[in-house]
């Protein structure tokens, strides 16, 4: 199944230092593609960073077109960040598409990334960010920086990888978001009740703010 993704023309053997002059060139280096799983893995294995699709030849949330992948970084540098451990997680083994060691991985300090390719693309930046945040919430040990709609992921030259070939349905993403927002609403209610006496009408407004109609929210 072709996936909408953007691949950089850069081949990064290591991370680009903050403030490096090359960042502008890098942000303009992503080309919108439609690739199958092996094509994406080949790009990552060759050291090419990937991100969501953008317009105007510039990677930014304002230029977001769509995203058809979600990814989680596991950087604990222990057994829980190994490919073997992650591939045995029930959710990952069912819905994960592939796992690879990251550019910062060391055998004595393992780091890995799980990619979930979606059956349909997410068409709005705010909804992509929400989906990424919800997945992070479900995996409390994942790197919290993975939720930006313009977030890119470095390739990892010569990385180890495991192909799982799972696909994460958009309907499942919506369910995860619903649970994520519900947990936030419940926490807000507990905080309000602990500190204030709030009129029923205001409490309902707060609840609604955390429970948008799912419908076509992700499209």
Regions found by a protein language model. Give the residues of each.
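Short, polar loop/linker segments at the starts of domains and inter-domain junctions
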Residues: 19-29, 164-172, 206
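Helical (often loop-to-helix) elements that flank the catalytic cores of nucleotide-handling enzymes
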Residues: 81-89, 117-142, 163-180
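Short, hydrophobic/amphipathic alpha-helical patches that form generic packing surfaces
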Residues: 47, 154-157, 219
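Electropositive, intrinsically flexible nucleic-acid-contacting patches
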Residues: 4-14, 150-153, 158-159, 172
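Long, charged low-complexity interaction segments
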Residues: 4, 98-101, 178-219
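Signature for HUH/AEP ssDNA processing cores
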Residues: 1-110, 117-130
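Short, conserved secondary-structure transition motifs
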Residues: 105-107, 116-117, 144-168
